[in-house]
């Protein structure tokens, strides 16, 4: 060892722009950032949760209480905070709902862990205890789940309605939940349920009550020629991922025309090719054609002459939905088309929807692709309605896949909190403290539901625990009346996987953050802050060691 090292002189291995925060400072910094994210969405939880107005740099406004939308729209730079954002995204991808619950759980687990760290409990010990508690929690939920079948339509509609609660769809919740269940059951097949086959068309104008389900596909296009029929009944449909145009040569060539007759010959030949294309469609019996690319003007003329309704530049996703709905096949080249490739619909026609012309492909037998038309008075209303419907579609799909649900209203969390406290007694070592902290953290959900409903959280928790001590697993908090009621009887239920995924994701995120004891930044992670003495940066600002805050979240932790 060199003399310099023996004298305690540190060896500099990082660049001068690099920043490093280690030990308790790093843990505290990351925990603070994670808690700030959870705090930002906490007031949106439950049927009486508040909305957030998010304004981006371009002045675009989003009004929502959907957890994952809020976090996606916020300008979050802090790496630990982004881990919590990923929790909400995972929850959304896996089950479609419960994003706010997952994030709040993660934030509270970090808060409880901070107290244990202050009491000299090692982060690894906390991580082990949290994982044991999470496994036990999932086991308890599995044991108490309620079985649901595809035939239990009443329960399915209640699940759909629960997912919409507090998301701007209250006035038409009964109608919308019926539409959602109809849509999911319509696209269900032997391979499972792909909610991407439920297309959502937003229409500004009318009321939410005017929303409807079309068993078929709506294409946001018009006929290419006004001389084409406005509607076709009992239509054979060609779906072409190609152009009805004369193909250009791949090699640039120059042709010298010395005689006007030669030019006319070129034009005649081009017209002949286009007519042959249309003749191919007529020959296979097509009454309507949807094309993914362009349609030449001359081809449009011949199509109209043959009474074929044509649509050009349809989106690839629309072509796939058309094929699924009508039983047709997307053909990549017109030369390959055969009669067996055509789909069938009882009606193909152009209709006015909210002032815009769209093509409706309806009356499809056993349609495996459907369209929900959502109406509302303003753009903000239909946007939030779309988010509510997407959540609802996700939970109905998850319920049909798993066949198990749980009561809502904070009932599962209250039961888990009690059972995990008992379980902690059987856990040896300091992990017992972590299991108890996990149980304490789960109380955040019923407590937040009570706070957001303007109720006393302590009184509500006491009532809930008392009922659960008496063996009432389904006892949950009614945010409208403030009473503790049987949520299963009330029809407030949600998929089992929403809760298990929320616990799993929150636990993994919290454990990952707790195990970080060193943050090394290769450059300036100031998060866009100026670094001036006057800039407070808000709750999640300082990252210790000169590291930055959470960008657009500076000061938002306390504001929300």
UniProtKB/Swiss-Prot annotation:
Q: Per the entry, what induces it? A: By heat shock (at protein level).
Q: Where is the composition biased (Gly residues)?
A: 538-550
SUPFAM superfamilies attached to this UniProt entry: GroEL apical domain-like, GroEL equatorial domain-like, GroEL-intermediate domain like
Concerning Pfam families, the annotation shows: Cpn60_TCP1 (PF00118)
Q: Which InterPro entries match?
A: Chaperone_TCP-1, Chaperonin_TCP-1_CS, Cpn60/GroEL/TCP-1, GroEL-like_apical_dom_sf, GROEL-like_equatorial_sf, TCP-1-like_intermed_sf, TCP-1_chaperonin, thermosome_alpha
Q: How does it assemble?
A: The thermosome or CCT complex is a oligomeric complex of two octameric double-ring structures; the complex is probably a heterooligomer of CCT1, CCT2 and CCT3 with yet unknown stoichiometry.
Q: Which family does it belong to?
A: Belongs to the TCP-1 chaperonin family.
Q: What else is known?
A: Can substitute for loss of cct2 or cct3. One of either cct1 or cct2 is required for growth.
Q: What does this protein do?
A: Molecular chaperone that assists in the folding or refolding of nascent or denatured proteins along with ATP hydrolysis. ATPase activity is highest in thermosome assemblies containing CCT1:CCT2, followed by assemblies containing CCT1:CCT2:CCT3. Required for thermosome ATPase activity. Not required for growth.
Query: Which PANTHER family does the protein's record reference?
Result: CHAPERONIN
What protein name does the entry list?
Thermosome subunit 1
């Amino acid at each position: 060892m060199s003399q310099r090292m023996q004298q305690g002189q540190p060896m500099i291995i990082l660049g001068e722009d690099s920043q490093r925060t280690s030990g308790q400072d790093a843990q505290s910094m990351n925990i603070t950032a994670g808690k700030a994210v959870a705090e930002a969405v906490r007031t949106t939880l439950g049927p009486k949760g508040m909305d957030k107005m998010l304004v981006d740099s371009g002045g675009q406004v989003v009004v929502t209480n959907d957890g994952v939308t809020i976090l996606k729209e916020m300008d979050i730079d802090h790496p630990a905070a982004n881990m919590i954002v990923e929790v909400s995204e995972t929850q959304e991808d896996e089950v479609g709902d419960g994003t706010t619950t997952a994030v709040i759980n993660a934030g509270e687990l970090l808060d409880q862990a901070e107290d244990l760290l202050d009491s000299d409990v090692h982060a690894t010990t906390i991580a082990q205890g949290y994982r044991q508690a999470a496994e036990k929690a999932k086991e308890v939920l599995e044991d108490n789940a309620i079985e649901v079948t595809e035939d239990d339509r009443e329960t399915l509609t209640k699940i759909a309605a629960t997912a919409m609660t507090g998301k701007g769809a209250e006035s038409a919740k009964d109608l919308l939940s019926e539409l959602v269940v109809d849509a999911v059951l319509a696209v269900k097949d032997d391979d499972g349920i792909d909610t991407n086959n439920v297309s959502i068309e937003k229409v500004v104008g009318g009321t939410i009550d005017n929303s409807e389900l079309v068993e078929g596909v709506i294409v946001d296009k018009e006929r290419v020629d006004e001389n084409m029929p406005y509607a076709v009944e009992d239509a054979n449909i060609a779906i072409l991922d190609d152009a009805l145009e004369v193909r250009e040569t791949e090699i640039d060539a120059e042709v010298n025309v010395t005689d006007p007759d030669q030019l006319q010959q070129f034009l005649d030949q081009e017209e002949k090719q286009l007519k042959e294309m249309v003749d191919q469609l007529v020959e296979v019996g097509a009454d309507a054609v949807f094309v993914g690319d362009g349609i030449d003007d001359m081809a449009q003329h011949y199509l109209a002459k043959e009474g074929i309704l044509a649509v050009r530049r349809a989106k690839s996703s629309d072509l796939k939905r058309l094929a699924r709905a009508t039983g047709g096949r997307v053909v990549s080249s017109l030369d390959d088309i055969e009669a067996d490739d055509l789909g069938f619909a009882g009606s193909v026609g152009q209709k006015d929807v909210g002032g815009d012309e769209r093509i409706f492909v309806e009356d499809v037998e056993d349609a495996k692709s459907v369209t929900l038309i959502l109406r509302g008075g303003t753009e903000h209303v239909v946007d939030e309605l779309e988010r509510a419907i997407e959540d609802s579609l996700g939970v109905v799909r998850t319920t049909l896949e798993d066949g198990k649900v749980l009561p809502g209203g904070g009932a599962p969390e209250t039961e888990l909190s009690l059972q995990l406290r008992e379980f902690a007694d059987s856990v040896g070592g300091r992990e017992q403290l972590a299991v108890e902290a996990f149980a304490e953290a789960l109380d955040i959900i019923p407590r937040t539901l009570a706070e957001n409903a303007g109720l006393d959280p302590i009184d509500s928790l006491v009532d809930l625990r008392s009922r659960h001590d008496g063996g009432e697993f389904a006892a949950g908090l009614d945010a409208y009346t403030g009473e503790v009621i049987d949520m299963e009887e009330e029809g407030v239920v949600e998929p089992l996987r929403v809760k298990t995924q929320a616990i799993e994701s929150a636990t993994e995120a919290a454990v990952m953050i707790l195990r970080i004891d060193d943050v090394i930044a290769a450059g300036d992670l100031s998060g866009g802050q100026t670094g001036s003495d006057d800039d407070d940066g808000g709750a999640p600002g300082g990252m210790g060691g000169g590291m930055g805050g959470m960008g657009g979240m500076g000061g938002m932790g306390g504001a929300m």
